[in-house]
Swiss-Prot record:
Expressed by the skin glands. The keyword Signal does not apply. Keywords: Amphibian defense peptide, Antimicrobial, Secreted. GO terms for biological process: defense response. Belongs to the gastrin/cholecystokinin family. It is found in: Secreted. The keyword Manganese does not apply. Antimicrobial peptide. GO terms for cellular component: extracellular region. This is Caerulein precursor fragment R2.
Amino acid sequence: GFGSLLGKALKAGLKLGANLLGGAPQQ
């Protein structure tokens, strides 16, 4: 449902934020 989608987006955002803060972007 919508909650599951939101959770996925949140997790992805946290991962991106951690990578950016760690100075190791995976792009």
